[in-house]
Structure formats: structure tokens, C-alpha cells
């Protein structure tokens, strides 16, 4: 009954962005740019992908994202990644290397954020395609 009333209230006041538990909601461009949990999660996902694939990619654009309330927040983000022009050297900081602009990769990262656990972010899935 409570869920029915919540849905009815959301529909009656025209709230397209009403986030119900379990409901998947597409994030606006403004939300994507300002959501610290999402942006930190994207960094986490890219770092994990780089570690797993021995790559040196950096996120250059969050194309789209969705969020779902579960036991935490489940995010799915479509990210454009570009390689850095650096030799694989642990002494070289990736942020100082120039971007290689002609080889974008698009990845869909799904990760979970749970503020109450020690490891706040966990990867659920990764799918990447070189453009």
C-alpha cells in the first residue's frame, strides 16, 4: 500500500526523477557532473579495469549513467576512455602523460556503493568496446 501511495504521489506531481527503492533512474547531465559518489565510482572502476587489463586508460567523458537504490546505490555508467602516451613505468604518473585522441574505448561499468562497508565500492560488471 505504501509503495502504491508513493507512486501515486510521484505521478500526481509530475516527478519524473522520483527515485523509488529498486527503480532504475537515468541521471541528468547536471547530476552526472555533480554526483561525487558516481564520479569517485568511475575513478574506482577505471582504476580496476586498468589493473585487470594492464592498461593506462583515463576517463574523458561520462556519456550516460543510471542509478538504482538497492542495498546501497547501484550505478551503471557508460564512459569514454582514452589511452595515455606513456611507457608502462611505475615511476611515471599517468596524470602527467598526454592523451592519445584517436583511440577511444567505450566501457559500461556497473558498480555498487555501500557507505557502511569498509570497501565502499565494488565492481559488478565491465563491458568495453574499442570505437
UniProtKB/Swiss-Prot annotation:
Signal peptide: 1-18
Subcellular location: Secreted; Nematocyst
Cystine bridges: 86-97, 107-128
One Pfam match: Cystatin
Site entry (Reactive site), positions: 22
Source domain of life: Eukaryota
Keyword Cell membrane: no
UniProt GO MF annotations: cysteine-type endopeptidase inhibitor activity
One GO CC term on file: extracellular space
Motif segment (Secondary area of contact): 68-72
Domain Cystatin: 35-109
Record keywords: Disulfide bond, Nematocyst, Protease inhibitor, Secreted, Signal, Thiol protease inhibitor
InterPro entries membership: Cystatin_dom (IPR000010), Cystatin_sf (IPR046350)
Main localisation: secreted
Database matches in Gene3D superfamilies: 3.10.450.10
Function noted in UniProt: This recombinant protein inhibits the C1 cysteine protease papain (Ki is below 0.5 nM).
Anything else known: Activity of this protein is stable at pH 4-11 at 4 degrees Celsius, but unstable at neutral pH at >50 degrees Celsius.
Membership in a protein family: Belongs to the cystatin family.
Listed name of the protein: Cystatin J
Organism this protein belongs to: Cyanea capillata (Lion's mane jellyfish)
Lineage: Eukaryota, Metazoa, Cnidaria, Scyphozoa, Semaeostomeae
